[in-house]
Structure formats: structure tokens, C-alpha cells
Amino acid sequence: MDSSKIKNVVNQQRKFFQTGATLPVKFRIEALKKLKANILANEKEIAAAITADLGKSETEAFMCEIGLVITEISYMLKHVRKFAKDKTVSTPLSNFPAHSFVKSSPYGNVLIMSPWNYPF
């Protein structure tokens, strides 16, 4: 993929984020469920590719890569509502009777730098 295509993809992702479609927790849960379902549906093909490319056994491919990703997705599915929930914090006496909280919300697009072949 050349730099102009990368730039185009990044711009499309930024525009999509600006629509606010990704803000609801429900959207994030559905995206994680789709990712998990696709990984599970293609588990044998992913394991075969890891075996062919890296020489890992299918067991090692599952334990160290596929299973690891599935476990992380499952963890996020279980806890994403808690992570996105507003957190009550103490309010200075000078602001009585106000209530203070920290609102968790996505910042936007991120760049993830990781090895090209791990996990799969």
C-alpha cells in the first residue's frame, strides 16, 4: 500500500469518527463481536497461515496468537461498559452542592505500531 492510499484510508477513518457513530458503547460492542466472530470463523485459515509463514505448530499458533486475541476481545466485551461509564470524583467544598465526574470518551483515531506478524 503506497502512502497516498494510506493517507486516503486515514482520512476516511477520521471522517467516520467525526460522524459520532463510534461513540455509543453499543457500536463498540458490536464491532468487537464482529471481529471475534470473524477470527473464530477463520481460525483454521489463520492458524495455517501462521504455520506456513512462521513455522509455528497449530497449537502454538492458537495458544500464543489466536487464543490470546480472542481472550483480549472477550475481556473487553465483558468490561467495556465499565470502562466507558462516568466516574464520580470528589467535588471541592467551594462548589457545593455540585457533583463532579470524569467522562470517558474516545479521543479519535490512533496509530498502533506493532510487529507486522504478531499477533497474526
Predicted segments with their positions:
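Conserved small-residue-rich beta-alpha loop and adjacent elements
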Residues: 91-120
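N-terminal Rossmann-like NAD(P)+-binding subdomain of aldehyde/semialdehyde dehydrogenases
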Residues: 1-101
